[in-house]
Curated annotation (Swiss-Prot):
One of its GO terms (molecular function) is unfolded protein binding. GO terms for biological process: protein folding; protein tetramerization; protein transport. The keyword Protein transport applies. Keywords: Chaperone, Cytoplasm, Protein transport, Translocation, Transport. Its main location: cytoplasm. InterPro entries: SecB, SecB-like_sf. Belongs to the SecB family. GO terms for cellular component: cytoplasm. This is Protein-export protein SecB. Homotetramer, a dimer of dimers. One homotetramer interacts with 1 SecA dimer.
Length: 163
């Protein structure tokens, strides 16, 4: 009996030519946490900070036919004009995408792939803010389809304005 799987074997339920997304690797590309006012910012009774969130999705094809997708999440908390904390994570994934029409590839890369990466990036931010002495910062689920549509509309509006 052997535990090796033949290279030509396909994952359960996947047949040749069937559309699918496989995550081959996921990784932290960049990670930063700043806590400039510690320990003073951690005092009890301090006013709730204002938090500014940012999200970016980027994808690029590789020569080997795979795709790298990066999800960048950033959060900056300020109280009385001073940074309380600033966290930024770029979480990446290496994807194999098969059976997807060329016109559908961009939405898959910038909506579905970030959706797979989001829980891991969210956990990193939650963990590091807790380790920084703050309550865990839990990012609400992100509507990646809405973000994609808004950015696409904005880009098309800029192209029309520049024509």
């Amino acid at each position: 009996m052997t535990d090796t799987i033949a290279p030509e074997a396909t994952p359960e339920g996947a047949e040749a030519g069937q559309a699918g997304i496989r995550i081959l690797a996921q990784f932290v590309r960049d990670f930063s946490f700043e806590n400039p006012l510690a320990p003073d910012a951690l005092r009890a009774g301090a006013a709730q900070p204002a938090i500014d969130m940012g999200v970016e999705m980027n994808a690029r094809g590789r020569a080997d036919g795979l795709f790298e997708v990066d999800l960048k999440l950033s959060a900056r908390a300020e109280r009385e004009g001073q940074a309380v904390f600033h966290v930024e994570v770029v979480y990446g994934g290496l994807f194999h995408i098969a059976g997807i029409a060329e016109e559908d590839l961009e939405p898959v890369l910038l909506i579905e792939c970030p959706r797979f990466l989001f829980p891991y990036a969210r956990r990193l931010i939650s963990d590091v803010t807790a380790e920084g002495g703050f309550p865990p910062f839990l990012i609400d689920p992100i509507d990646f389809a809405g973000v994609y549509a808004a950015r696409k509309a904005q880009a098309e509006g800029q192209q029309v304005g520049n024509a």
